Amino acid sequence: MQVKYYESVFKLDTLPLDAIHVIDNWYPKDNWVQFNNALKVTNRWSFDNDVTYEDGETTEITWIMRLFRKWMKPAGNYVEFARPVIEQMCNDFGIEFEQFDFAGINGQTQGLQGTIHKDSFRPRNITFLWHCNTEWDNNWGGKFRVYQKDTLDKGHRGFSEELVENYQIAEIEYKPNRLIIVDGSYPHSADAPNNKSGYAFRKTFVARGNVAKLVDK
């Protein structure tokens, strides 16, 4: 699947998605700063974000701040600072969720390697992934990876160099205020910060739904 890079927003014109869309400098700077100021004082992180397969094996546990559950049900009274982010995602790209499934912030430090998983099995799904950190060094790692659609069906799980070499179809660097729009039925993973990153905390704001439609906004 092709990766397309942009410097400004645009209206999506096809579902299922026919490309991985990457928008740099996405969120307005003042809003981005306001969001991160609110995030810093919202102490709702939990260390129980896992990837567990059908046979019960768990291959990933990372930090997570849960924000909205299915049908945009708030996870608590602390989440409203994040609602405008989701609204802007939908408005900027002409999307309406007919079935919204989840929003939250994934967090990784050194050693918390993301492992291969899918977000959806439905054709008209959308996953938004916003790199919400305000600072990130190019040498810290943290790449987002996408794999061939049938990789999990072939029994692959976890993360390995073999997986990257034989099944990876896209690799996108972590960059502050970068937004990725991807078909969540493609397996994907996120690298942890590497050993050059010190105490860096790699954060990704995730909003996804199993069923979306294009609207003219």
Listing of model-derived features with the role each one plays in the protein:
Residues 87-217:
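Catalytic core of non-heme Fe(II) oxygenases with the double-stranded beta-helix
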Residues 2-96:
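Non-heme Fe(II)/2-oxoglutarate
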